[in-house]
């Protein structure tokens, strides 16, 4: 899809290391007020 390669626009302040599950990134991005990312 058009959003399949979307990433957080700003590095997460709370999420450390590599994302192992998209849901982790999505939650971190949303928690910090950014659009959902992969």
From Swiss-Prot:
The keyword Secreted applies. InterPro entries: Defensin_plant, Scorpion_toxin-like_sf. It comes from the Eukaryota. Pfam families: Gamma-thionin. Its main location: secreted. One of its GO terms (biological process) is defense response to fungus. Belongs to the DEFL family. Group IV subfamily. Antimicrobial peptide. Active against Fusarium spp., Gram-positive and Gram-negative bacterial pathogens. This is Defensin D7. It comes from Spinacia oleracea (Spinach). The lineage of its organism: Eukaryota, Viridiplantae, Streptophyta, Embryophyta, Tracheophyta.
